[in-house]
A protein has these predicted regions:
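Extended charged
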Residues: 1-173
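Short, charged surface segments at domain edges that flank catalytic/cofactor-binding sites
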Residues: 165-202
Length: 202
């Protein structure tokens, strides 16, 4: 249990360059791993992952206790981000995950995006899962990372290193279109979708 917590924490922090908190919770005799970007005020969202009945991998994504800001930002995501979100969702479906996404207790549809989000509940399942423990844990860690990418695709996140890069690019490149192109290519979510659409295995 502690080893898997460490694997999840290291993978997420190395990939996203931000601190994460992993909490193991026992529910009905099963260990649930609750993962979230580190914040003391519980203002973001959590990804909860567990193995159910030893045959099904389950991922649930939901806002934290004081996640109103995140709900508002997701609700007002521009159409470009909404499109990226649904493309990523389809990619996960093509990887064998069954999904159920609801907002305000109604199905979230591409042509019906609520402008007010009071709550959201995204659930994905994968069955069957490998019998080999190491292989199963590798899939679990990978799918948790994908789950965070799914939500991050709707949010505006810019790190300092990227800002510094863009400032230098403005001085050398000089056009808005080139800067937008650089930003897009450096975004790991966009890059992953591009590779996926071109038929590369990711």
């Amino acid at each position: 249990m502690e080893e898997l917590c460490l694997k999840l924490k290291q993978d997420l922090e190395n990939y996203f360059s931000m601190p994460f908190e992993i909490q193991p919770v026992f529910k009905d005799g099963e260990v649930h791993y609750v993962c979230s970007p580190y914040n003391e005020d519980q203002m973001y969202f959590s990804v909860e992952v567990y193995i159910h009945n030893k045959i099904r991998l389950v991922i649930e994504i939901y806002p934290q206790k004081h996640g109103g800001y995140i709900l508002n930002e997701m609700a007002h995501a521009p159409e470009e981000k909404q499109s990226t979100f649904f493309s990523y969702k389809q990619m996960l479906v093509d990887k064998g995950l069954k999904s159920c996404y609801s907002v305000n207790k109604s199905d979230l549809l591409e042509n019906k995006w609520p402008i007010t989000w009071r709550t959201f509940d995204f659930k994905m399942t994968k069955i069957p899962i490998p019998d080999n423990v190491n292989e199963c844990e590798s899939i679990l860690v990978e799918l948790v990372r994908y789950s965070f990418e799914l939500i991050f695709s709707l949010l505006t996140i810019t790190d300092i290193s990227e800002e510094e890069f863009l400032q230098k690019a403005v001085q050398t490149e000089g056009t808005i279109q080139e800067i937008k192109s650089i930003r897009y290519e450096r975004n790991p979510i966009n890059r992953k979708l591009c590779l996926y659409k071109k038929g590369y295995k990711i």
